[in-house]
Amino acid sequence: MNTIYSKHHFLVSVIVGLLLGISVTDSALLIFVTALYAGIIGVIIDIDHFAISRLHSGDWSAAKNCLRFPVQSLIYQEDIFGEEEVEPAERVLSHLLISGVVVPVIWVFTPRWSFVTGVVLYVHILTNAYADASGYFD
């Protein structure tokens, strides 16, 4: 299975955040905050992979190992999950379900950040689909 890792999602999300920030403000601080927020959202959505892995493996070993060895988890991401613990279709479905809840909830409090969140999550799902289809990020 081809995959895209956190470093790729972070970079793509920061670029999206920069473009969104630049398009609506001249404030360097707000552009920076938007890019940072986008980077965080673009990576944090993948926390659902641990729940999917738990469903397949029957335990939380992937999450426990990442908490025990966080630096290794960032460097050797390909070793976090066992083979076929996180299937592409499940990952995409989970991301769509989370996005469909998170974006409207944020909209209630702040439409601007809801828009940023929605765009970043959309791009996240697109990059996953592209990586799954092409193997470009391997």
Residue spans for each PLM region:
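N-terminal membrane-targeting hydrophobic helices
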Residues: 1-138
